[in-house]
UniProtKB/Swiss-Prot annotation:
It comes from the Eukaryota. May form heterodimeric complex with the TALE/BELL proteins. Interacts with OFP1, OFP2, OFP3, OFP4 and OFP6. Residues 215-278 bind DNA. Keywords: DNA-binding, Homeobox, Nucleus. It comes from Arabidopsis thaliana (Mouse-ear cress). The gene is KNAT7. The keyword DNA-binding applies. This is Homeobox protein knotted-1-like 7. It is found in: Nucleus. CDD domains: homeodomain. One of its GO terms (cellular component) is nucleus. It holds the Pfam family KNOX1.
């Protein structure tokens, strides 16, 4: 980054005798960047790129290194005294550089989430296929472990009939490197959690909209308490034949302020709710008449 910045500042010097001058200009420019208001943003963009492909168990290493960075920052800042480039030009450069880093981070995330996961899953498929064909169980970073019945079989693949050694000093049955390491598994788990979070965030608003629509329809389907009181009173008075005529419905519409469709639906639902009770009452009545 410093070399690119020097190029933008026009600080190109030639000749072996100017090496010390170039080195000093580098130090001065580092100092200006270290004391620039965008330094924290620049550092965060770098770290964000680094975190993308770093397994979860190794993230504390980054934090530990960042905790020690203030020593280097203080050293750079001390060299910036009395040396100033065109501030506007440096501002533009750092702003563009941060944008490049943000774009690079997105590309890294795309690579990790698609290509890296596909590669690891392909290795897993190879492992499963090999197990189906040979019964071999592959151990991470080690050779295949065969079943007990096959332990005594000679498996010397160190060279072929041509006398050429293809093993390179390693056991040719060792398919371990094809398997995902603990770091790769950790990375896959991190990608899975990030994708899960993104999906949850992406669908959160949609889920809330659907929930609100359901609640709205429920609220719309419920009739005010005072109106249902009028309908229930009519029902109690006509429980033997709870089928209002058109004139009855028109009167209920006037009294309750409900729509005719709402009243029809209420009586339909009310008859369904009381169907069992009515059937039981009719059966009892018929039974009494027989006796």
């Amino acid at each position: 980054m410093q070399e690119a910045a020097l190029g933008m500042m026009g600080a190109t010097v030639g000749g072996d005798g100017d090496t010390a001058v170039v080195a000093e200009q580098n130090r001065q420019l580092k100092g200006e960047i270290a004391t620039h208001p965008m330094y924290e943003q620049l550092l965060a963009a770098h770290v964000a790129c680094l975190r993308v492909a770093t397994p979860i168990d190794q993230l504390p290493i980054i934090e530990a290194q960042l905790s020690q960075s203030h020593h280097l920052l203080r050293s750079y800042a001390s060299t910036a005294v009395g040396y100033h480039h065109d501030r506007h030009e440096l501002d533009n450069f750092l702003a563009q550089y941060v944008m490049v880093l943000c774009s690079f981070k997105e590309q890294l995330q795309q690579h990790v989430r698609v290509h890296a996961v596909e590669a690891v899953m392909a290795c897993r498929e190879i492992e499963n296929n090999l197990h189906s064909l040979t019964g071999a169980t592959l151990g991470e970073g080690s050779g295949a472990t065969m079943s007990e019945d096959e332990d005594d079989l000679p498996m010397d693949f160190s060279s072929d009939n041509s006398g050429v050694d293809f093993s390179g000093g390693h056991d040719m049955t060792g398919f371990g490197p094809l398997l995902p390491t603990e770091s790769e598994r950790s990375l896959m788990e991190r990608v899975r959690q990030e994708l899960k979070l993104e999906l949850k965030q992406g669908f959160k608003s949609r889920i809330e909209d659907v929930r609100e629509e359901i609640m709205r329809k429920r609220r719309a389907g419920k009739l005010p308490g005072d109106t249902t009181t009028v309908l229930k009173n009519w029902w109690q008075q006509h429980c033997k034949w709870p089928y209002p005529t058109e004139d009855d419905k028109a009167k209920l519409v006037e009294e309750t302020g409900l729509q005719l469709k709402q009243i029809n639906n209420w009586f339909i639902n009310q008859r369904k709710r009381n169907w069992h009770n009515n059937s039981h009452s009719l059966t009892s009545l018929k039974s009494k008449r027989k006796h």
